């Protein structure tokens, strides 16, 4: 399925995997073709997605509008009611995720999108 799957956390994880690190990626994606396509994209870059939680109605999306003449580029986010937005405390098994982790990376937007995610 065509699309660009990303975001700051995915981009950081992919960069670390590209440099040879063992990266386990944690998020929540819906069942169905869109969720599968997102996971396939992450796997293609060598990310371990075994801790990804499945469920919710949709992927969060963002739209990029290129700059034209004197106007800057714009990004519009549509995250409300996405799978990650509706992630609840206890859905991620943090004990397992962090058991062998040397480093944990999380951006500030993660907590802002889903207060219960952490």
Predicted feature residues:
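Ribokinase/PfkB-type carbohydrate-kinase core domain
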Residues: 41-43, 49, 68-118
């Amino acid at each position: 399925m065509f699309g660009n799957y990303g975001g700051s956390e995915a981009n950081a994880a992919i960069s670390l995997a590209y440099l040879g690190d063992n990266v386990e990626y944690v998020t929540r994606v819906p069942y169905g073709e869109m969720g599968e396509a997102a996971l396939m994209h992450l796997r293609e870059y060598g990310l371990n997605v075994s801790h990804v939680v499945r469920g919710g109605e949709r992927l969060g999306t963002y739209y990029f509008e290129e700059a034209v003449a004197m106007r800057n580029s714009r990004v519009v986010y549509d995250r409300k009611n996405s799978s990650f937005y509706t992630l609840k405390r206890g859905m991620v098994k943090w004990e397992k995720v962090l058991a062998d982790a040397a480093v944990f990376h999380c951006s500030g937007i993660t907590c802002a999108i889903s207060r219960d995610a952490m």
